């Protein structure tokens, strides 16, 4: 077990009593939530000119933190009053009033609360959440838009501009898409094991092939620095890029919500059973999304879809990839083998026979989409009543079924390949959305040096030996240097060392490519 530390929590007095009177939360949890909101705000919006807006942003983070592990306390659809201590409209007005995009950001935040509280409450088997998770896997572009909202990414970017009194600058939708995709790719690559310990449905590499995680992080990081250079002299540049920079990795070391100290100053350790157990107890304010087991006596119509998915699970669980998600390529979502001649009757059966609990509530929420959902979400949910692919693994109720597994849809090989291509196209899409960005081609790999045959003189080593003797005698020191110096005793120049490093990296890339083939 990792060591436990008695943390002292620091946060400004402005938020120190926000949760007074809220039942169901201990005083220790309240203080940790205040400190977490302060630390996150300081990390992702390190500079500000408007303290009142800054405090309002902290309050949105406090509410969000509670929603992430005690969803039953936050019901944005029921009332403007959140937990009896916040007027949501007042908080959002304090943050965005008079700024461009205000109405869009209000809908963005309400969507986050609606879906997040659904995931962390007893309503996780609802029709809303089932369709939401189905929609996550529909396509890479819709995934990144939904993940953007789930991470409050564009919301925080807009808040960062507001907190710096920048009212004449607002990214386009396309620019928001790319900025948040870069940030979410970086964050999810680092948070891979954290999210897996939580049984998350929302991690990029639960859908993008996990063997791309390191390469995707590397490329996204390059795009971050390309944007940083392109917008270095624009006032909004540092504000927007700083959010991505800190959100994409450093917060895992600086915020106490993560396990950097508890895990020996490391980032990215695979989760253990002990970590999962702590997650269930909300240690570090984490939350475990376990698959829900059907209650005894449940009717066949209630669990018909679970029966279909369980047959797939038993078939596909024999093979898993690095993402912790099973490969569902050999079967349809109904458990029928992929060589079946017709899938249309099956799809009709899935949409007409099964409907999760809370269907009426889902329809009423959909009718309020202009109030409670970001603009694209209504369409995503409407077309997610049935599977988008008959070879991917869909379920009626989502959550991790065992340790080292994510909790969402498990994509088939064909869909994973399509997602791979989308992620690989990131640099081209960044250049289209941000014309000022100038992409650079990486330098060509150095040619491999031939290994001298036995008895063959190494001319480069001889030259280094000669240079060393000349340098030493010219300085008036070590004049008794022997006429020849063994090559292995001669200090190597920096260019020679770097050349060997590049060759080693090429060899490693070759080995990775070979492994990927198999």
Swiss-Prot record:
Compositionally biased tracts (Low complexity): 299-339
Q: Which gene encodes it?
A: ABA3
According to its UniProt record, the EC number is: 4.2.3.-
Q: Which organism is it from?
A: Pyricularia oryzae (strain Y34) (Rice blast fungus)
Q: What does this protein do?
A: Alpha-ionylideneethane synthase involved in the biosynthesis of abscisic acid (ABA), a phytohormone that acts antagonistically toward salicylic acid (SA), jasmonic acid (JA) and ethylene (ETH) signaling, to impede plant defense responses. During pathogen-host interaction, ABA plays a dual role in disease severity by increasing plant susceptibility and accelerating pathogenesis in the fungus itself.
Superkingdom of origin: Eukaryota
Entry's family note: Belongs to the alpha-ionylideneethane synthase family.
Q: Which GO terms describe its molecular function?
A: lyase activity
- Annotated region (Disordered), positions in chain: 294-355, 440-466
The protein's enzyme class: lyase
Keyword set, alphabetical order:
Lyase, Virulence
What lineage is on file?
Eukaryota, Fungi, Dikarya, Ascomycota, Pezizomycotina
Q: Pathway involvement?
A: Hormone biosynthesis
Q: What is this protein called?
A: Alpha-ionylideneethane synthase abl3
């Amino acid at each position: 077990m990792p060591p436990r530390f008695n943390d002292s929590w620091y946060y400004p007095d402005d938020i120190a009593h926000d949760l007074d009177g809220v039942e169901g939360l201990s005083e220790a949890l309240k203080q940790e939530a205040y400190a977490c909101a302060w630390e996150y705000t300081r990390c992702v919006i390190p500079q500000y000119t408007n303290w009142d807006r800054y405090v309002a942003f902290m309050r949105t983070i406090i509410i969000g933190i509670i929603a992430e592990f005690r969803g039953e306390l936050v019901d944005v659809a029921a009332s403007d009053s959140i937990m009896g201590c916040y007027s949501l409209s007042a908080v959002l007005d304090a943050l965005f009033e008079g700024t461009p995009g205000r109405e869009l950001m209000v809908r963005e935040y309400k969507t986050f609360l609606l879906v997040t509280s659904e995931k962390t409450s007893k309503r996780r088997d609802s029709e809303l959440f089932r369709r939401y998770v189905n929609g996550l896997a529909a396509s890479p572009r819709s995934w990144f838009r939904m993940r953007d909202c789930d991470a409050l990414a564009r919301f925080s970017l807009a808040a960062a501009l507001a907190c710096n009194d920048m009212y004449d600058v607002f990214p386009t939708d396309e620019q928001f898409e790319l900025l948040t995709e870069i940030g979410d790719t970086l964050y999810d690559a680092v948070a891979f094991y954290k999210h897996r310990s939580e049984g998350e449905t929302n991690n990029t590499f639960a859908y993008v092939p996990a063997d791309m995680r390191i390469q995707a992080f590397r490329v996204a990081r390059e795009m971050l620095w390309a944007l940083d250079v392109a917008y270095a002299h624009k006032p909004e540049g540092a504000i927007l890029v700083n959010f991505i920079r800190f959100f994409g990795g450093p917060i895992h070391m600086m915020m106490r919500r993560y396990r950097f100290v508890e895990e020996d100053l490391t980032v990215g350790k695979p989760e253990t059973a002990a970590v999962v157990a702590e997650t269930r107890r909300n240690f570090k304010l984490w939350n475990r999304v376990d698959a829900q087991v059907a209650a005894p006596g449940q009717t066949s119509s209630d669990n018909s879809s679970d029966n279909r998915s369980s047959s797939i699970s038993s078939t596909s669980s024999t093979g898993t990839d690095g993402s912790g998600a099973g490969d569902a390529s050999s079967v349809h979502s109904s458990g029928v083998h992929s060589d079946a001649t017709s899938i249309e009757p099956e799809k009709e059966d899935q949409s007409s026979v099964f409907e999760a609990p809370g269907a009426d509530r889902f329809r009423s929420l959909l009718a309020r989409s202009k109030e409670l959902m970001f603009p694209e979400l209504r369409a995503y949910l409407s077309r997610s009543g049935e599977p988008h692919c008959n070879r991917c693994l869909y379920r009626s109720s989502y959550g991790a079924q065992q340790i080292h597994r994510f909790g969402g849809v498990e994509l088939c090989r064909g869909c994973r390949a399509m997602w791979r291509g989308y992620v690989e196209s990131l640099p081209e899409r960044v250049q289209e959305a941000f014309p000022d960005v100038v992409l650079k081609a990486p330098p060509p790999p150095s040619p491999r040096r031939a290994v001298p045959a036995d008895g063959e003189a190494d001319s480069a080593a001889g030259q280094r030996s000669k240079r060393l003797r000349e340098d030493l005698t010219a300085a008036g020191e070590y004049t008794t240097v022997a006429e020849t110096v063994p090559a292995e005793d001669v200090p190597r120049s920096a260019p020679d060392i770097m050349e060997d490093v590049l060759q080693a990296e090429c060899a490693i890339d070759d080995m990775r490519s070979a492994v990927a083939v198999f």
